[in-house]
Swiss-Prot record:
GO terms for cellular component: actin cytoskeleton; Arp2/3 protein complex; mitochondrion. Present with 1920 molecules/cell in log phase SD medium. Pfam families: P21-Arc. This is Actin-related protein 2/3 complex subunit 3. Keywords: Actin-binding, Cytoplasm, Cytoskeleton, Isopeptide bond, Ubl conjugation. The lineage of its organism: Eukaryota, Fungi, Dikarya, Ascomycota, Saccharomycotina. Component of the Arp2/3 complex composed of ARP2, ARP3, ARC40/p41-ARC, ARC35/p34-ARC, ARC18/p21-ARC, ARC19/p20-ARC and ARC16/p16-ARC. It comes from Saccharomyces cerevisiae (strain ATCC 204508 / S288c) (Baker's yeast). Transmembrane segments: none annotated.
C-alpha cells in the first residue's frame, strides 16, 4: 500500500515557490507571508489528517512540490508530539508547543536539516531564505495550535492529551526527525 500524497495542485509557473518548496495558502490567524486559503481545508489540515497513516512509511515518493510541505508538516507534528507527555495539561501544552514553534529551527537546504536531499532551495538568495523562514515559522505556529485542538479534543475537560495521538511519538516518518 503506497503512502498518501498531497492533494493540493501546485503549478511551479504560477504558484509561489522558494526553490522546490511550495508556499501554499493557509487558514491562519498568525501573521506571515502566506496568502489566505480559498477553502476551509488547507495543507495544515491535510498534514494532520495524513500524519497517522503516513507515519508508518519509511519511503515516500515525492509527486509534487506540495508533498515537500506535507513531509515538513509530518516531521514537525512528530516533533511536537515528542514534547508532550501523558500528564501535560492543555495550558502547559500551549506553552510548550508555542515555544517549539518559535524556537530556532534549521531551514531546508541549510546544514543540519535532516532531508536536504529532498529540498533544493537557493541558500545564497537571502530574500528567498527570509521568505521561506517566515513562511515556515507561520506554518509551524498554526500547525502547533491545530494539533493541540485535535490532541486535546477527545477528552471532555481538555485536561490530558489523547493517548492515541501520543502513541505515534515512537514512530519516525522516513526514519527522520527535525
Amino acid at each position: 500500500m503506497p503512502a498518501y500524497h498531497s492533494t493540493f495542485p501546485v503549478d511551479p509557473n504560477t504558484d509561489r515557490m522558494v526553490g522546490n518548496f511550495a508556499l501554499l495558502p493557509l487558514n491562519t490567524k498568525f501573521r506571515g507571508p502566506a496568502y489566505p486559503s480559498n477553502s476551509d481545508y488547507d495543507i495544515i489540515d491535510e498534514c494532520l489528517d495524513l500524519f497517522r497513516a503516513n507515519s508508518f512509511f519509511k519511503n515516500f515518493e515525492i509527486k509534487s512540490p506540495a508533498d515537500r510541505v506535507l513531509i515538513y508538516g509530518i516531521l514537525f507534528i512528530n516533533d511536537c508530539l515528542a514534547h508532550l507527555k501523558i500528564t501535560t495539561s492543555f495550558n502547559e501544552a500551549v506553552k510548550v508547543l508555542t515555544n517549539v514553534a518559535l524556537d530556532n529551527f534549521t531551514l531546508p537546504g541549510t546544514p543540519g536539516f535532516p532531508l536536504n536531499n529532498v529540498y533544493q532551495v537557493p541558500v545564497q538568495d537571502h530574500n528567498s531564505m527570509d521568505l521561506l523562514k517566515t513562511y515556515i515559522q507561520q506554518f509551524r505556529q498554526e500547525l502547533a495550535m491545530r494539533l493541540l485542538e485535535r490532541v486535546y479534543s477527545s477528552t471532555d475537560s481538555k485536561e490530558y492529551p489523547s493517548k492515541f495521538w501520543l502513541a505515534f511519538t515512537r514512530r519516525r516518518f522516513m526514519n527522520k526527525s527535525l
